[in-house]
């Protein structure tokens, strides 16, 4: 036997073909959501309140401080919130202190600041009763970026940008004449020396001393019209505020507020970290030749002589001195924006390309501390110095698609930014109220208006592009949605603007973002998925784990380091499949490794790190595809995406050929019931499981509290699939923390089970599997193999109207007793009733305007009190294709104290459940991107059968394999067959699964033929087919594209208001568009009358269609068609352009067109009791 047995959960053993031992457990897969939100509750909120306090009024006399905050208990549980359509939230209370500096009076109060949405245990939010997910956003990190550009004459230049988290941008660029310019906040460009003068370096000499003499600087100084700090300030002010009279004071305060005011300019932690990293002198001196001797100022010791090349060793030696004191200079700017001195660090080096001894100044920003969040003059000088250095080939340009320069904004940060907007709006209100209200009687509660805060949070959860309705089709879809990374959204890219480079796979994605899982279509590459082992660090950069190689011994240790893309660029990393000895020594001398995006073969001494696992490259969904290594990447992409569309089946099976990821994915998805404390199972029911806890007391294990775990039974998911949990433990089982107690939807025995294992043959059959179509045995219908349950929710509300309240009642005008047989006395359908299209669910009547009655009618009304004319029937009926069994009915009444929207008195919800067997037209797929539509369901007896008489279940077209290059399905087929004969389950992990020899070995062990094919007999004739056929077990899933949802036919329905043509689409009960090309086809056939009918009475000849309906009802001949409405619209449009357009007959008389507002059609419609509906488009 090849492979070894591995236990997954309590119930499932698989034979695993993995050769590489896993050093690291997979992390919790939804940690990206939960930990980010936890950070927000613990620190993010506190940061916000610290940033904003104190709020002072304009005189500085009153000051309002936020001291502490606390979250209360939520009003309802998560399940109750879903039922009542409310938000799962907890009240946020803030302790506020108001200080009156004149009187010294201090008032403290607890202020309620709205209900704050809470995250559920599974990483989602319940907003207005619907589960939503906040997707993480990939954005450019705030930092300073340098990039090369080539102008139209082929001359190389550079551009640089300092991008803050919020605030004004600073951009540098060169032009064709070698002048360096700066743009402040996207305005017109100025020579860069103007900015330096404005900072207080007024004379040419000071600037030259700072940056070192070079021709770029002299060109720029020539171009610069200013010659003093004052002139430079005025020049900048004129650019930023054109049209306002410039003064030096105004210019200073403008620059200070633009760049040096922490409230207006914020780099955030990550921006400060990136800028320090980029501009710090130690990173810029690497491999450069010194042009001065470095001396320790304290001892006078020479650390490095002039002309020394600073390699890694030398740099490491002088690093402590660099951090401390070498090259520190204090610049003393005069009269500029900057008050006080500027600390700089400057060292001279030789330019690498110069023949002579051209000296360059390298200016560092003297490593500003982490808590300075705004930009400093030191940063500006260092960034300009870096720019000049680049012109002499010192320094690197940046790649903005590198993951070291893109970071994630997860839930916590997105919420914090939104909360900040709300607080700053509130701050304005507080300031205004401080100056208006009486200072003595004022209280914190009276100052604070919480509306803007609540509004900004509501707006974010309700309508932000990143707050999405959770994809709940199956557990894998849920999990993937929570791990999604989007480059779209506010502050991100747009689909139209995003180029090819942003979407492409980049070498830094390795182990961080999945190169396979991304949507097809306009969003390709903009929406990605987090790799299986990846984590997000405090700065929002994605890290991936590597095993450290001990530099002394060269052994691979068990120690794991998480590296960001930036850090990884400094190391040589070996692949996970390198052969190791027991101790962890590399067995090969030459090793395939990666270094900065290049694959290199290098000596084992040079290796710094090694991959943790082969599946660290791919995401959770991609890691569920067995034999991924044998599939073409385009098809693997489809396979990963289609698994997310699998409909939960009534009785699912986990795959015979799996990858070992099924257990982890199912457990972390949040669909299963997980045990929270170790204990023993005391009771198991369909709806709950009781676990008695084990507690340690004095070293003894004793029984403690009882935990009751409730199951969700037949709940409608967001996508209308059925969400149902079933217990998989028995009474007396001892369970541990984290064990699965109950399967969720699409799970079996604790493993993900999206489809079923079926017997598949690759063969054609009478051409029915042309173009990827699938032929299926009727057994799969009869035995409910692919039967799924779907639940649809319908609601009806009784509102107050101008003419009186609507009423939910059994007494409906013009409806026979037969139609009411399933309604109870309230007029609401009973649970368990079977309903068909058009049946009543909720009887409801709406008052209609009373017309003037004649005397006789009034008399009748007085005698019989006949009410039929005053109300019209607005009952809720079952729509087309919606029939089924009533699963549940919920009634909410205003009188009973239920929270309902304004104007609604009663709300009724009915849930209809359908059991959908598989049928022709349904879409199915394997896990390798092999999808198809069922074209024929054959009786079992007509299916080809194996020599032992077993009919096969599905026939696939063999031509679907070679051109698509997804050979994984063939390997899965053969291995699955062998596993079925052996009665085992198999795990073949991604990139480390069964090799060819393993597959053949298992086939031999199972006693199958040595070509793994078999003779098949035709079920109709009993004759064997000419050739042997590949038959085996394949895992097939039923996708959420079902024919029942797509089939649609229109009778008389709504029309568009302007053109009077039928609407389009199933949702509007619309028609099929008969377009230009279809008209050509009928013209070609000479079918003139058919065509005229289609273009007039079946479409927009308003009078004609009513008359035609009348003629059909009365059995008369259909009248002549009239003028289509769209023709009248065309004429009106031409007339609106000022053209005189008339319709003339052949004898030059004008034809009068009657207007649509003709009562004729409405009268004839009334006679026939037809409702003529018109709808706005």
Swiss-Prot record:
One of its GO terms (molecular function) is ribonucleoside binding. Keywords: DNA-directed RNA polymerase, Nucleotidyltransferase, Transcription, Transferase. PROSITE patterns: RNA_POL_BETA. SUPFAM superfamilies: beta and beta-prime subunits of DNA dependent RNA-polymerase (SSF64484). Residues 1162-1177 have a biased composition (Basic and acidic residues). It catalyses: RNA(n) + a ribonucleoside 5'-triphosphate = RNA(n+1) + diphosphate. Gene3D superfamilies: 2.40.50.100, 2.40.50.150, 3.90.1100.10, DNA-directed RNA polymerase, beta subunit, external 1 domain, DNA-directed RNA polymerase, subunit 2, domain 6, RNA polymerase alpha subunit dimerisation domain, RNA polymerase Rpb2, domain 2. GO terms for cellular component: DNA-directed RNA polymerase complex. Residues 1147-1177 are annotated as: Disordered. GO terms for biological process: DNA-templated transcription. Residues 1147-1161 have a biased composition (Acidic residues). It is an enzyme of class 2 (transferase). Its EC number is 2.7.7.6. It comes from the Bacteria. Belongs to the RNA polymerase beta chain family. DNA-dependent RNA polymerase catalyzes the transcription of DNA into RNA using the four ribonucleoside triphosphates as substrates. The RNAP catalytic core consists of 2 alpha, 1 beta, 1 beta' and 1 omega subunit. When a sigma factor is associated with the core the holoenzyme is formed, which can initiate transcription. This is DNA-directed RNA polymerase subunit beta. It comes from Bacillus thuringiensis (strain Al Hakam).
